[in-house]
């Protein structure tokens, strides 16, 4: 979160385009924070993308012949079918670039990212800066009404800076006690 993942993906895609390569960029429908279809970084850099519901729709939108580069942003939001699809593309000689969060707001492995990371030839883990202490931030802090979220809150809740901020290990807080149910005290 705020480490420049989308910005780096955009930079790499633009380099491939400058090199004359055929490129396709995909993102999940779920990510509509800044634009319905473009991949957009927090600082406004953007590149055209195709927004898809799942890995099956991504596969259906791959042209024949295949592009030389396929890029996927926010991969943590995709279904498990994305993993074998990207492996298949790589096996066919397509350069695959993926951006996504490795951990959710609870600091737990996020969706399909652990498997994608394990199977990648190259992994570059970017960090932000913790706004609390200035240390490298490797975690995503979810804030609800300015307070740290509870562990039992839903994992997927797409937002921008008003809902999330980067945190270091020391400053990352997740409330582990379950929320009291209404009427539980009474």
Where are these regions (language model features)?
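Short basic (Lys/Arg) and small-residue
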Residues: 120
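Conserved P-loop
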Residues: 1-64, 104-115, 125-128, 149-151, ...
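Short acidic/histidine-rich motifs immediately flanking catalytic phosphotransfer sites
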Residues: 64-69, 75
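Anion (oxyanion) recognition and catalysis
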Residues: 17, 90-91
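Conserved ATPase-coupling elements of RecA-like P-loop NTPase cores
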Residues: 74-89, 105-110, 179
């Amino acid at each position: 979160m705020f480490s420049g993942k989308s910005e780096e993906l955009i930079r790499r895609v633009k380099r491939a385009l400058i090199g004359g390569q055929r490129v396709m960029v995909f993102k999940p429908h779920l990510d509509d924070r800044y634009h319905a279809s473009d991949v957009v970084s927090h600082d406004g850099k953007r590149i055209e993308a195709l927004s898809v519901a799942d890995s099956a729709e991504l596969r259906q939108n791959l042209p024949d012949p295949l592009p030389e580069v396929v890029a996927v942003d926010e991969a943590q939001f995709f279904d498990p079918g994305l993993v074998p699809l990207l492996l298949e593309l790589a096996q066919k000689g397509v350069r695959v670039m993926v951006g996504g969060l490795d951990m959710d707001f609870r600091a737990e492995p996020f969706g399909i990212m652990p498997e994608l990371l394990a199977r990648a030839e190259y992994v570059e883990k970017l960090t932000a800066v913790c706004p609390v202490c200035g240390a490298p931030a490797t975690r995503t802090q979810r804030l609800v009404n300015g307070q740290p979220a509870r562990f039992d809150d839903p994992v997927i809740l797409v937002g921008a800076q008003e809902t999330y901020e980067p945190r270091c290990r020391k400053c990352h807080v997740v409330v582990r006690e379950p929320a009291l149910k209404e009427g539980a005290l009474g």
